[in-house]
Each structure stands twice: as C-alpha cells, then as structure tokens.
A protein has these predicted regions:
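Bacterial N-terminal signal peptides
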Residues: 9-23
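Sec/Tat signal peptide C-region and signal peptidase I cleavage site
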Residues: 24-29
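N-terminal secretory signal peptides that target proteins for export/translocation
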Residues: 1-6
C-alpha cells in the first residue's frame, strides 16, 4: 500500500508539473494578443497608406490568428518624421516605414541606405534587390540598427525617384537657382549643380509650390499623383534618379523581443512580401499614370540626355561615395564595407570603370 501511495503521489506531481509546464510554455504564451502602433511616413490617400500597409497589417493579423493587431497612423499623427527613431527606441511606437537617411548624422549606416544613395547607382528593381538583399547591404544595416535598440526588417522598394517643376528643366544647366523640395543625396546632388534644395514634409509641399516658395519637388513618382502636384507642376523630369527609391521597415527591439518566435517569423515573411508587392504595384500604376493620366493632366515628360546621366554619375555620384567612405567611414567600418560593395556592384554592371 505504501508503495502504491508513493506511486500515486508521484503521478500527481508529474501531472501537476505537466500542466505547469504547459502554462509556462511558448504555446500558452502564444495565446497573448499584442497591439502595435505603426507610424507611416506617408499621408492618407497615398499608395502605401491606402494599399501596401493595410495589406501587410491584414496579412499579419490573419497569419497570426489575431494575435498581433497593428493600427496604422499616418505621417505626423503620433510623432513627426524626425522623432520616429527615438520613439521606436522608447517603444512609444512599435513599427514604422521610414527613411534611415533622416538619422544619418547619428547612425552612420544611414549614409548607405538606398534612400540616401546618389543618382544612378541601381537602375532596375532587380539590381536594387541584388545589391541590398543579396550582396550584404541589408545585413550591415541590420547589425547597426540592432546596436540602436531597433530591429531591422529590411529595405523595401517604394518606387522610382523623379522630380517635377513649374517650368521646363531641360538639362543640368537649367538647375541653377531652382528651388526644389528634395531629400538626402538627392538634395546634395541638386546643390552641387546649382539648385537650392529644401526639405519639407510632404503635406506642406503643394502650398509651397503654389505660393512660389518652391519651384518644384522630387520624391517617389506616386507623390506627384497622390498629392496632386500635377496641378502646380506641369513638367515631369526623367530619367529617374533612383531606381528605385527605398525605405526601411523598423521595429522597436523591445516590442520585437516580446513576441513569440512564430510571430517574428510571420513578420519577417510579410516584410519580404510587402517589398515585392510594392515593387509590382509601382510598375503597374506608374505606367498607368504615364499612359492615362499625363494626357488628362497636361503633364509634359522631359527626358534628360545620356550625357547628363553620365555627367551626374562621374562628377557627383562616384565622388560622393568616396567622400562618404572617407568622412563617415571612421565612425563605423560598416560604412566603408558598404561603399566597397556598392562600387563593386557598379563595376560589375559597367556603370563605372
């Protein structure tokens, strides 16, 4: 009887231990519902906010069985774009699509993000995908962001970078005195060739052009359509300076670490899908704009010569990369490594000697 009693007691402890293990197991923890805030870089009505990001949010909620719910907030609703980085670090917001170039002063790898590359580095979606996702640039940036308390979900294609104007800009020579809203290396390029670049949030640009504060603007092609810049800028200048422009998907490390591994894997997969989906929709809708909307709006497409493209590449873009390596490289060796990767890529494609 004593043996039987001991066996029964042991079985009770085993069963209790089993249920305790279940209650503490990842499977039980996985039942927790997480609520995230997404701060978008773009405004309501834009391609990302109306299509791309909502699809991401819906996909993640469905794939997690409702365990991760994300609420989208438009540009400036939670914090201004300049405050997204510290807000992520503090876990005030949990996820953001933004441009790391805005913090290139404090995070050196911001200088080698796709959004900050000078003109004519990559010249197709496939080239961008190769350079960032397969030649190691995203890996370098992920390491740097981790040191800042931010988890990096990769660079994503947001469409080609053009600029547009109230007056014809037929060549580089016409840039002198041109007051333009631009960003990062695009602003640096404009300044090099005599223009006067200004950085303004997207919602303020239309009025600035209307009142004469600006002569034009430059960014992703769809901003021309979605912000109705065609009403104030009838001249649209190509070829695109960045093919494509890209941004980064950043997550608060604190929020990331709180997630079960399966939800982390779902987010990683959803980020890859988002980049591909963004690239596809960009190509489809951009061509629709040229084919159907330009005639209706009265927009004139001005195509610069190959000579201008070659001059920008050799006179500005290549020296700019070397300057970044020399001046920013000592702050983070990943910047030097990144520039080496970029220049080798350009040699492989015959863009530089």
């Amino acid at each position: 009887m004593k043996v039987r009693s001991l066996l029964l007691t042991g079985m009770v402890f085993v069963i209790l231990g089993f249920f305790a293990a279940i209650s503490l197991s990842p499977a039980a923890a996985a039942d927790e519902v997480f609520h995230w805030k997404w701060q978008a870089h773009q405004t309501a009505g834009s391609l990302p906010c109306e299509t791309i990001i909502p699809r991401f949010i819906k996909r993640v909620e469905e794939m997690t069985g409702g365990r991760l719910k994300i609420t989208l907030h438009y540009a400036g609703e939670l914090v201004e774009y300049t405050e997204v980085f510290p807000a992520l670090q503090a876990n005030m917001i949990q996820i953001a699509n933004t441009g790391a170039l805005f913090w290139r002063g404090s995070v050196p790898v911001g200088w080698i993000t796709a959004g900050n590359l000078p003109p004519f580095i990559t010249r197709s979606d496939a080239e961008f995908n190769e350079l960032y996702h397969h030649r190691g640039l995203d890996k370098l940036m992920g390491e740097a962001w981790a040191e800042q308390g931010i988890h990096f979900l990769g660079s994503h294609n947001v469409g080609d970078t053009y600029f547009w104007s109230k007056k014809p800009i037929n060549s580089l020579e016409d840039l002198k005195g041109f007051k333009v809203r631009f960003f990062g290396a695009m602003s640096d390029t404009m300044e090099h060739f005599g223009a006067s670049p200004i950085m303004l949030p997207h919602p303020e640009v239309y009025m600035a052009i209307s009142t004469g504060t600006l002569d034009g603007a430059g960014t992703c092609w769809w901003q021309y359509r979605d912000l109705k810049h065609y009403e104030v800028c009838p001249y649209y200048i190509g070829p695109p300076w960045q093919v494509p422009q890209a941004m980064e998907l950043l997550v608060s490390q604190k929020a990331w670490d709180a997630l079960p591994r399966d939800i982390q894997a779902i987010l990683e997969t959803a980020a890859i899908v988002m980049s591909k989906e963004f690239a596809d929709l960009n190509r489809i809708e951009e061509q629709e704009m040229y084919r159907e909307s330009f005639p209706k709006w009265g927009t004139k497409f001005i195509q610069w010569s190959e000579g201008d493209v070659d001059r920008i590449t050799k006179e500005f873009s290549l020296p700019y990369l070397d300057k970044i390596a020399a001046e920013v490289g000592p702050k983070d060796p990943r910047v030097v490594k990144g520039i080496e990767i970029i220049k080798q890529f350009m040699r492989d494609y015959g863009y530089i000697d």
